[in-house]
Amino acid sequence: MPYILCGGHTVTTNDDGTFYINVQSPNGKKADYAAYTIGPFGTGFDQAGEYTAQRWDTSDTNRIRFRLWNTKDNRWCGRVAIFGSWVAIWNRQ
């Protein structure tokens, strides 16, 4: 069975649309898999479905970097506030 960590997260991205999730590696290695889902969205939130999160960097053992893509404008996002859920998985090897 793999090691699995997950949680909720509120963040304002950097100017280049990147943000980090801090994790505590259970085996001293970087995560083998990581994903971020934006939402849930409250009523009146008109940006639902406008952004997707791409895993951008996992070279650090205890944090994972994501970058937001703006699906409406087909470009990387700038600074934006989001809420979402994340999951990180490490293989047991």
PLM features: residue spans?
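Extracellular attachment/recognition segments
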Residues: M1-Q93
